[in-house]
């Protein structure tokens, strides 16, 4: 029934059903399978007709069809066209981001038909006239580059940085060759054996896979006059120089000048195309076929001559297109960037006190927001050992049984990233002293112990306000029934929170007063715990992450937040007022 409905819709849009055996034999959809077929249609453009085949997905209601180009005007063969891959697939919509009425098949496929027409018109216009070609290709230019290998940039590369590249070459278990290029800034912390070794380890590359030499690497900005409609991707170094000559002759001259000046055998060039992305190449020259020293001190007009010579088959012995992947610290943290005007977590001195369930989850969240990855540092405090009984509620593995949680967690964080970090674990309790506390910008109390929280709230008030760190108390309440986070920025304290007569009775949240909290705990000599799953601790860690990040904004929006899993409704985030009966605040008035 649905197939018949879809068939009628496609016919109404001007499509006809074509068996795969009747398609052009060069098309990747061609097949002798007598049962297989596709809906095809010719779309009109100023350059001629474009024939499209639609590949209908398993569920046409929630999956849009794939558009494949069967026939394209001859003038566009091997040319770069926006939204058309080299294999011939047309990207007419970003399906994962799109929204449509999945219950209205007719309107959905009519819109697909119209969108394909619009996309083809824009693509042809860009290829023929350069009309909005940079905009049409934005974000997808390098998708048509077709690299043979990957190059990972571990430093923040730009035109002003001096770069060098290492090559890792090894053999996969199936016998195929595995090559990876690794680029770093010469004067950066990433240019060290420790960082490179960490990268190889994380990438499961053998230590001995690294070649002994490094390659001269240059970062070149390209401001192309146009990008669409040109032959792409360049199949040789000669073709690349030809493309640069048409797109941006200054960039081409820089490439030749670097080779002329240095006279080396091997080069890596990274091309940063304006408003597009970065792609790279590796070239190797046969120095027996060309004496580069002859050109080093020659006249400026020799650049054009050298350009012609370098493109020769006997001179350029190797040419590889490289896919450039940025893996520097800014890229790693780019999706967690705060609003403009906010401080960076990587610059903050942070102490995480308590590396149990909450602290374990929180530490990983903090790292991914930059903690310990810049000028600041992340210190982890806990004197507790990690036991098998902790496994169900912790991020650590069986490898860490019998080891200090703080040390194991610090090692896990450092091993999860290839770049240098300032993360240190201390196998001891945090000493609640004013001189130690003021060495930090943010202190996170994840102990879940009221005596620790009250003592921190008291001692921090002996520090002058301008030198005082922000204290963030994170804890599960009601034996796992609630997640709570409180930011002590000086206006109220932990004591104020538990002294509020409207919400607390004898230090216990009034919503949990009817529960026999003590009875639910498992108590042994030297060990007390409450059995509940890790979900509440995950939530508390996430709330604490929000609290930490909110302290980076110019102004705090709240100091208290909670999430109730059972026992009542969650209160909205708010500023907790100072309580006149708070013993801590009253002591320091």
Curated annotation (Swiss-Prot):
Source organism superkingdom: Bacteria
InterPro entries (UniProt xref): Prok-E2_B_dom, ThiF/MoeB/HesA, ThiF_NAD_FAD-bd, Ubiquitin-activating_enz
Record's function text: CD-NTase priming component of a CBASS antiviral system. CBASS (cyclic oligonucleotide-based antiphage signaling system) provides immunity against bacteriophages. The CD-NTase protein (DncV) synthesizes cyclic nucleotides in response to infection; these serve as specific second messenger signals. The signals activate a diverse range of effectors, leading to bacterial cell death and thus abortive phage infection. A type II-A(GA) CBASS system.
Induction: Part of a CBASS operon consisting of capV-dncV-cap2-cap3.
Gene Ontology biological-process annotations: cyclic threonylcarbamoyladenosine biosynthetic process; defense response to virus
GO molecular function annotations of the record: transferase activity; tRNA threonylcarbamoyladenosine dehydratase; ubiquitin-like modifier activating enzyme activity
Gene behind the chain: cap2
Record bears the keyword Transferase: yes
Outcome reported for the amino acid change (mutating residue 91 to A): Loss of defense against phage lambda (partial), T4, T5 and T6 but not T2 or P1. No longer conjugates DncV to cellular proteins
Name of the protein in its database record: ATP-dependent ubiquitin transferase-like protein Cap2
Assembly notes: A Cap2 dimer is bound on either side by a DncV monomer.
Pfam families for this protein: Prok-E2_B, ThiF
Cross-link named Glycyl lysine isopeptide (Lys-Gly) (interchain with G-Cter in DncV), sites: 77, 305, 387, 484, 523
EC number(s) per entry: 2.3.2.-
Family: In the C-terminal section; belongs to the HesA/MoeB/ThiF family.
Cross-link (Glycyl cysteine dithioester (Cys-Gly) (interchain with G-Cter in DncV)): 13, 493, 513
Recorded domain comment: Has an N-terminal E2-like domain, a linker and a C-terminal adenylation plus E1-like domain, dimerizes via the E1-like domain.
Description of post-translational modifications: Conjugated to DncV via 5 different Lys residues and 3 Cys residues.
Matches recorded under SUPFAM superfamilies: Activating enzymes of the ubiquitin-like proteins (SSF69572)
Residues the record marks as active site: 91, 493, 496, 513
UniProt entry keywords in alphabetical sequence: Antiviral defense, Isopeptide bond, Thioester bond, Transferase
